[in-house]
């Protein structure tokens, strides 16, 4: 795997003490009209599954990484499939 995908750009890195930890789980992602991406995140206190810890200030970088990895092409055609699909980043 390309190491550039694993780390944010140097100019986007924040000082270690500025990062705040929040447990989040990506529960759904789909395309809206106009090929716009829509992602639904939930804090782990709202779900029974243990999820991956992510950095709040790094959320935009993580969303961009997911887009580059192709998650923006995912679509969910039925509401019950969307509600049943819970994705935890490991």
Curated annotation (Swiss-Prot):
One of its GO terms (cellular component) is host cell perinuclear region of cytoplasm. One of its GO terms (biological process) is negative regulation of RIG-I signaling pathway. Keywords: Host cytoplasm, Host-virus interaction, Inhibition of host innate immune response by virus, Inhibition of host RLR pathway by virus, Viral immunoevasion. Coiled coil: none annotated. Its main location: host cell. It is found in: Host cytoplasm, Host perinuclear region; Host cytoplasm. Belongs to the hantavirus NS-S protein family. Antagonizes host type-I IFN signaling pathway. Expressed from the S segment by a leaky scanning mechanism. This is Non-structural protein NS-S. It comes from Puumala virus (strain Sotkamo/V-2969/81). The gene is N.
């Amino acid at each position: 795997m390309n190491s550039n995908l694993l780390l944010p750009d140097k100019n986007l890195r924040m000082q270690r003490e500025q990062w705040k930890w929040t447990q989040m789980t990506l529960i759904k992602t789909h395309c809206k009209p106009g090929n716009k991406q829509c992602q639904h995140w939930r804090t782990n206190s709202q779900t029974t599954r243990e999820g991956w810890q992510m950095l709040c200030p790094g959320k935009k970088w993580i969303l961009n990484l997911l887009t580059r990895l192709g998650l923006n092409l995912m679509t969910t055609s039925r509401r019950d499939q969307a509600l049943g699909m819970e994705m935890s980043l490991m």
